[in-house]
Protein backbone atom coordinates (compact mmCIF):
# COMPACT_ATOMS: atom_id res chain seq x y z
CA UNK A 1 0.00 0.00 0.00
CA UNK A 2 2.88 2.43 0.54
CA UNK A 3 4.39 2.19 -2.94
CA UNK A 4 3.69 5.21 -5.09
CA UNK A 5 1.13 4.43 -7.79
CA UNK A 6 -0.96 6.49 -10.19
CA UNK A 7 -3.67 8.27 -8.15
CA UNK A 8 -7.22 8.85 -9.30
CA UNK A 9 -6.40 12.57 -9.43
CA UNK A 10 -3.45 14.18 -11.22
CA UNK A 11 -0.62 14.82 -8.78
CA UNK A 12 -0.98 18.58 -9.16
CA UNK A 13 -4.74 18.62 -8.52
CA UNK A 14 -6.46 19.21 -5.19
CA UNK A 15 -7.79 16.17 -3.39
CA UNK A 16 -10.27 18.33 -1.42
CA UNK A 17 -13.91 18.76 -2.40
CA UNK A 18 -13.81 22.43 -1.33
CA UNK A 19 -11.67 25.36 -2.39
CA UNK A 20 -12.34 27.30 0.82
CA UNK A 21 -9.40 27.83 3.19
CA UNK A 22 -8.82 25.13 5.79
CA UNK A 23 -9.70 26.25 9.31
CA UNK A 24 -7.06 25.52 11.97
CA UNK A 25 -7.97 24.94 15.61
CA UNK A 26 -5.02 24.84 18.01
CA UNK A 27 -6.33 23.05 21.09
CA UNK A 28 -3.24 22.63 23.25
CA UNK A 29 -3.20 19.62 25.58
CA UNK A 30 -6.46 17.66 25.24
CA UNK A 31 -7.69 14.35 26.62
CA UNK A 32 -7.81 11.72 23.86
CA UNK A 33 -11.45 10.75 24.36
CA UNK A 34 -12.54 14.38 24.29
CA UNK A 35 -10.60 14.94 21.06
CA UNK A 36 -12.07 11.80 19.50
CA UNK A 37 -15.59 12.93 20.38
CA UNK A 38 -14.86 16.34 18.85
CA UNK A 39 -13.57 14.70 15.67
CA UNK A 40 -16.74 12.63 15.35
CA UNK A 41 -18.91 15.73 15.79
CA UNK A 42 -16.92 17.75 13.25
CA UNK A 43 -16.90 14.85 10.81
CA UNK A 44 -20.70 14.74 10.78
CA UNK A 45 -20.92 18.52 10.44
CA UNK A 46 -18.49 18.43 7.51
CA UNK A 47 -20.46 15.65 5.81
CA UNK A 48 -23.49 17.95 5.85
CA UNK A 49 -21.48 21.04 4.77
CA UNK A 50 -22.20 22.77 8.07
CA UNK A 51 -18.51 23.66 8.48
CA UNK A 52 -15.46 24.03 6.25
CA UNK A 53 -12.51 21.66 6.29
CA UNK A 54 -10.62 21.90 9.57
CA UNK A 55 -7.37 20.63 11.07
CA UNK A 56 -7.18 20.08 14.82
CA UNK A 57 -3.72 20.70 16.30
CA UNK A 58 -3.01 19.33 19.76
CA UNK A 59 -1.07 17.14 22.15
CA UNK A 60 -2.43 14.35 24.34
CA UNK A 61 -1.68 13.29 27.90
CA UNK A 62 0.11 9.94 27.91
CA UNK A 63 -2.14 7.18 26.54
CA UNK A 64 -2.18 4.17 24.23
CA UNK A 65 -4.68 3.87 21.37
CA UNK A 66 -5.41 0.56 19.66
CA UNK A 67 -6.56 0.43 16.03
CA UNK A 68 -8.74 -2.22 14.48
CA UNK A 69 -5.91 -4.67 13.78
CA UNK A 70 -4.35 -4.60 17.25
CA UNK A 71 -3.45 -8.03 18.61
CA UNK A 72 -3.54 -9.08 22.30
CA UNK A 73 0.25 -9.47 22.28
CA UNK A 74 0.64 -5.82 21.18
CA UNK A 75 -0.96 -4.44 24.34
CA UNK A 76 1.01 -2.94 27.26
CA UNK A 77 1.44 -4.40 30.72
CA UNK A 78 2.50 -1.17 32.43
CA UNK A 79 -0.92 0.01 33.64
CA UNK A 80 -1.37 2.94 31.26
CA UNK A 81 -4.90 3.18 29.81
CA UNK A 82 -5.65 1.86 26.33
CA UNK A 83 -8.48 3.24 24.19
CA UNK A 84 -9.78 1.06 21.35
CA UNK A 85 -10.42 3.33 18.36
CA UNK A 86 -12.02 3.09 14.92
CA UNK A 87 -8.95 3.95 12.84
CA UNK A 88 -6.82 1.52 10.88
CA UNK A 89 -3.57 0.04 12.08
CA UNK A 90 -2.55 -1.36 15.44
CA UNK A 91 -1.44 0.10 18.77
CA UNK A 92 0.53 3.29 19.34
CA UNK A 93 1.32 5.78 22.08
CA UNK A 94 0.44 9.47 22.33
CA UNK A 95 1.84 11.90 24.86
CA UNK A 96 3.35 15.32 25.61
CA UNK A 97 5.98 16.45 23.14
CA UNK A 98 4.28 14.67 20.24
CA UNK A 99 2.61 16.92 17.66
CA UNK A 100 -0.80 15.52 16.69
CA UNK A 101 -2.94 16.79 13.81
CA UNK A 102 -6.40 15.56 12.90
CA UNK A 103 -7.52 16.78 9.45
CA UNK A 104 -11.30 16.80 8.98
CA UNK A 105 -11.30 17.04 5.19
CA UNK A 106 -14.11 16.31 2.72
CA UNK A 107 -12.42 14.46 -0.13
CA UNK A 108 -13.25 15.02 -3.79
CA UNK A 109 -14.88 12.20 -5.73
CA UNK A 110 -13.80 9.58 -6.59
CA UNK A 111 -12.31 9.12 -3.12
CA UNK A 112 -8.73 7.86 -3.22
CA UNK A 113 -7.70 6.87 0.31
CA UNK A 114 -4.20 5.80 -0.71
CA UNK A 115 -3.54 9.14 -2.41
CA UNK A 116 -4.76 10.98 0.70
CA UNK A 117 -2.43 8.97 2.95
CA UNK A 118 0.50 9.53 0.58
CA UNK A 119 -0.11 13.28 0.56
CA UNK A 120 -0.09 13.38 4.36
CA UNK A 121 3.15 11.39 4.34
CA UNK A 122 4.62 13.73 1.71
CA UNK A 123 3.88 16.75 3.90
CA UNK A 124 5.56 15.07 6.86
CA UNK A 125 8.59 14.01 4.82
CA UNK A 126 9.02 17.53 3.42
CA UNK A 127 8.94 19.13 6.87
CA UNK A 128 11.11 16.50 8.55
CA UNK A 129 13.73 16.73 5.79
CA UNK A 130 13.84 20.52 5.88
CA UNK A 131 14.21 20.52 9.67
CA UNK A 132 17.36 18.49 10.02
CA UNK A 133 16.70 14.89 8.88
CA UNK A 134 17.42 14.99 5.13
CA UNK A 135 17.33 11.21 4.63
CA UNK A 136 13.86 10.63 6.14
CA UNK A 137 11.51 8.71 3.87
CA UNK A 138 9.23 5.73 3.39
CA UNK A 139 9.53 2.00 3.86
CA UNK A 140 7.45 0.18 1.25
CA UNK A 141 4.89 -1.96 3.05
CA UNK A 142 4.70 0.31 6.10
CA UNK A 143 2.98 3.62 6.68
CA UNK A 144 4.50 6.65 8.34
CA UNK A 145 7.86 8.36 7.99
CA UNK A 146 11.13 6.64 8.81
CA UNK A 147 14.79 7.44 9.40
CA UNK A 148 17.08 4.84 7.82
CA UNK A 149 19.58 2.89 9.91
CA UNK A 150 22.62 0.89 8.88
CA UNK A 151 20.54 -2.30 9.14
CA UNK A 152 16.76 -2.86 8.84
CA UNK A 153 16.58 -3.35 12.61
CA UNK A 154 18.02 0.15 13.05
CA UNK A 155 15.34 1.88 10.91
CA UNK A 156 13.43 4.29 13.17
CA UNK A 157 9.90 5.63 12.89
CA UNK A 158 9.59 9.36 13.53
CA UNK A 159 5.98 9.96 12.43
CA UNK A 160 2.90 7.74 12.43
CA UNK A 161 -0.43 7.84 10.58
CA UNK A 162 -3.82 6.39 11.34
CA UNK A 163 -6.73 7.28 9.08
CA UNK A 164 -10.46 6.71 8.87
CA UNK A 165 -12.85 7.95 6.16
CA UNK A 166 -16.49 8.36 7.23
CA UNK A 167 -19.04 9.73 4.79
CA UNK A 168 -16.26 10.91 2.50
CA UNK A 169 -14.65 12.94 5.30
CA UNK A 170 -11.33 12.14 6.96
CA UNK A 171 -10.77 11.50 10.66
CA UNK A 172 -7.77 10.74 12.88
CA UNK A 173 -4.49 11.72 11.29
CA UNK A 174 -0.81 12.02 12.12
CA UNK A 175 1.55 12.11 15.07
CA UNK A 176 5.05 13.59 14.74
CA UNK A 177 7.53 12.76 17.51
CA UNK A 178 9.16 16.08 18.38
CA UNK A 179 10.63 16.13 21.90
CA UNK A 180 8.57 13.41 23.59
CA UNK A 181 9.93 10.47 25.54
CA UNK A 182 10.12 7.12 23.74
CA UNK A 183 9.98 5.16 27.00
CA UNK A 184 6.34 4.17 26.61
CA UNK A 185 6.95 2.50 23.25
CA UNK A 186 9.01 -0.11 25.11
CA UNK A 187 5.85 -1.58 26.63
CA UNK A 188 4.05 -2.24 23.34
CA UNK A 189 4.70 -3.47 19.81
CA UNK A 190 4.23 -0.03 18.21
CA UNK A 191 2.07 -0.22 15.10
CA UNK A 192 2.62 -3.99 15.19
CA UNK A 193 6.27 -3.55 14.13
CA UNK A 194 8.69 -5.52 16.28
CA UNK A 195 11.76 -5.38 14.01
CA UNK A 196 12.43 -1.62 13.97
CA UNK A 197 12.68 1.28 16.38
CA UNK A 198 11.10 4.63 17.24
CA UNK A 199 12.79 8.02 17.38
CA UNK A 200 12.06 11.74 17.74
CA UNK A 201 13.05 14.87 15.85
CA UNK A 202 15.07 16.02 18.87
CA UNK A 203 17.03 12.78 19.10
CA UNK A 204 17.90 12.83 15.42
CA UNK A 205 18.99 16.46 15.09
CA UNK A 206 20.70 16.68 18.47
CA UNK A 207 18.79 19.63 19.90
CA UNK A 208 15.31 20.38 21.21
CA UNK A 209 12.65 20.42 18.48
CA UNK A 210 9.35 21.50 20.00
CA UNK A 211 5.81 20.89 18.83
CA UNK A 212 5.36 24.65 18.61
CA UNK A 213 8.28 25.02 16.19
CA UNK A 214 6.90 22.32 13.89
CA UNK A 215 3.24 23.37 13.85
CA UNK A 216 3.28 26.17 11.25
CA UNK A 217 5.61 24.38 8.79
CA UNK A 218 3.56 21.18 8.94
CA UNK A 219 0.26 23.00 8.49
CA UNK A 220 1.66 24.78 5.43
CA UNK A 221 2.97 21.52 3.98
CA UNK A 222 -0.37 19.76 4.50
CA UNK A 223 -2.17 22.60 2.75
CA UNK A 224 0.27 22.36 -0.17
CA UNK A 225 -0.02 18.57 -0.35
CA UNK A 226 -3.82 18.57 -0.31
CA UNK A 227 -3.86 21.27 -3.01
CA UNK A 228 -1.37 19.45 -5.24
CA UNK A 229 1.34 22.08 -4.89
CA UNK A 230 3.54 19.58 -3.01
CA UNK A 231 3.66 16.55 -5.28
CA UNK A 232 4.00 13.01 -3.93
CA UNK A 233 7.37 11.49 -4.82
CA UNK A 234 9.00 8.13 -4.22
CA UNK A 235 11.09 8.56 -1.06
CA UNK A 236 11.31 4.84 -0.31
CA UNK A 237 14.65 3.54 0.96
CA UNK A 238 13.59 0.01 1.99
CA UNK A 239 10.74 -2.49 1.95
CA UNK A 240 9.32 -4.66 4.72
CA UNK A 241 6.27 -6.79 5.51
CA UNK A 242 3.08 -4.89 6.27
CA UNK A 243 2.12 -5.70 9.89
CA UNK A 244 -1.51 -4.69 9.30
CA UNK A 245 -2.18 -7.55 6.86
CA UNK A 246 -3.80 -9.69 9.53
CA UNK A 247 -7.47 -10.11 10.45
CA UNK A 248 -9.18 -7.25 12.24
CA UNK A 249 -10.30 -7.67 15.82
CA UNK A 250 -14.09 -7.98 16.26
UniProtKB/Swiss-Prot annotation:
Where does it localize? Cytoplasm
Residues binding substrate, per UniProt: 87-94, 160-162, 173-175
Active site residues per record:
191
Q: In chain numbering, where does the site feature Lowers pKa of active site Cys fall?
A: 157
Q: Does the keyword Endoplasmic reticulum apply?
A: no
Task: List the HAMAP family hit by this protein, alphabetically.
Answer: LipB (MF_00013)
Q: Which GO terms describe its cellular component?
A: cytoplasm
Reaction(s) catalysed by this chain's protein: octanoyl-[ACP] + L-lysyl-[protein] = N(6)-octanoyl-L-lysyl-[protein] + holo-[ACP] + H(+)
- Organism expressing this protein natively: Corynebacterium diphtheriae (strain ATCC 700971 / NCTC 13129 / Biotype gravis)
- Further comment found in the protein's record: In the reaction, the free carboxyl group of octanoic acid is attached via an amide linkage to the epsilon-amino group of a specific lysine residue of lipoyl domains of lipoate-dependent enzymes.
Q: What is its EC number?
A: 2.3.1.181
The name this protein goes by in its record = Octanoyltransferase
Report the protein's function: Catalyzes the transfer of endogenously produced octanoic acid from octanoyl-acyl-carrier-protein onto the lipoyl domains of lipoate-dependent enzymes. Lipoyl-ACP can also act as a substrate although octanoyl-ACP is likely to be the physiological substrate.
Q: Which residues form the signal peptide?
A: none
The source's domain of life comes to Bacteria
Q: What is the lineage of its organism?
A: Bacteria, Bacillati, Actinomycetota, Actinomycetes, Mycobacteriales
Residue ranges occupied by any BPL/LPL catalytic domain in the UniProt entry: 49-230
Say which family it is in: Belongs to the LipB family.
Amino acid sequence: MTAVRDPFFPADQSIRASHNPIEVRELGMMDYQRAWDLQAELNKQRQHDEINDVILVLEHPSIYTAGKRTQPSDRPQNGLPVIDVDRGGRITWHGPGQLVMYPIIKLAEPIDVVDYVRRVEEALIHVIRTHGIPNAGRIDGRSGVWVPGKTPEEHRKVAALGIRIAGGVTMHGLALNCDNTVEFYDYIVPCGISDAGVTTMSQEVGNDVTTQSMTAPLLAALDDAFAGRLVVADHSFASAPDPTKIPRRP
